[in-house]
A protein has these predicted regions:
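Switch II (G3) loop of P-loop NTPases
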Residues: 45, 81-115
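Phosphate-binding loop that captures ATP/GTP phosphates
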Residues: 30-82, 186
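Beta-strand-loop-alpha "switch" segments that mediate conformational coupling across diverse proteins
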Residues: 161-207
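Conserved beta-strand segments of the P-loop GTPase G domain that flank and frequently precede/overlap
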Residues: 44, 89-90, 126-130, 156-160
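Conserved C-terminal guanine-recognition region of P-loop GTPase G domains, centered on the G4
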Residues: 133-159, 163
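Walker A/P-loop phosphate-binding motif and the immediately C-terminal alpha-helix
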Residues: 2-45
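Conserved Switch II/interswitch segment of TRAFAC-class P-loop GTPases
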Residues: 94-98, 102, 106-108, 119-139, ...
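NTP-binding/hydrolysis catalytic cores, primarily Walker-type P-loop NTPases
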Residues: 202-247
Length: 247
């Protein structure tokens, strides 16, 4: 039975596609292939923009299978039955809908239904956050309005940090997560041009200093994600965090 790892944040531009593809690549590298030579790992795209599909198409060699599920809501319930050990799912952002209005915070359109179907299947959710204060509120909404009410285990990861800007931005973002009681990875995924060039996944990077460092971030996060395990992430809490999001 496949383990489903959903990469989700209401905010766009936080690196969901990057993380989905590279976590899939690392997992495929470590897991190897089945006796028939097929991969144990797939990356699925539920994003209508198709960023993960575009990036995967640019790879000379795909170490995983790539699945387009953006128009396939009927079969999402069957994903665990697919012949993979792990499936990493790239998801779209969505518009702000306050549940206090009585509406579903994911919305009622096709993609809201797809996100709900994915969360029904998810073993865990990876929530990328960047070190910018305008990312805090959508991250809070993703966790408080969606993940915690559904009881889905999750882990926040700080992504796309430019080291030249200083560690204070990481410390501030980590502190915000910890103040809200959100489990946040010790690994920080740094920003590198080799990531944004989108012609290779980290398992295909060269053995020079910069590309080794870029690759290391994802191997470290994959190890940390696996060691924590879905059952050890945030326990379901009664109620939600109602404090205003502070910059």
């Amino acid at each position: 039975m496949a383990k489903i790892h959903v990469v989700m944040n209401r905010k766009g531009g936080v690196g969901k596609s990057l993380i989905s593809l590279n976590m899939g690549a690392v997992c495929a590298d470590v897991r190897g292939t089945r006796p028939d030579g097929q991969p144990y790992v797939a990356v699925a795209s539920a994003d209508p923009q198709g960023t993960a599909l575009w990036r995967a198409a640019r790879l000379a060699v795909q170490p995983f299978d790539i699945l387009d599920i953006a128009d396939d809501i009927e079969n999402i319930a069957l994903m665990k039955q697919l012949p993979y050990a792990h499936i990493f799912v790239d998801t779209p952002g969505w518009a702000e809908i306050n549940p206090e209005t009585g509406l579903d915070p994911l919305g009622e359109d096709k993609y809201g239904r797809i996100l709900r179907a994915l969360l029904d299947q998810a073993d865990d959710v990876i929530v990328p956050v960047i070190t910018e204060v305008d990312c805090y509120e959508p991250t809070w909404q993703t966790i408080e309005w969606v993940l915690k009410p559904l009881g889905v285990p999750f882990q926040v990861v700080i992504n796309n940090w430019p080291p030249a800007e200083g560690i204070a931005y990481v410390d501030g973002t980590r502190g915000w997560c910890e103040d809200h009681g959100y489990p946040v990875a010790q690994t920080v995924i740094r920003r590198y041009r080799v990531h944004t060039n989108a012609t290779r996944v980290v398992t295909q990077y060269n053995n020079n200093r910069v590309e080794l460092q870029a690759r290391e971030d994802f191997y470290r996060f994959a190890l940390e994600h696996g060691l924590r395990g879905a059952e050890t992430r945030l326990p379901v809490q009664a109620g939600t965090d109602t404090e205003a999001v502070e910059a």
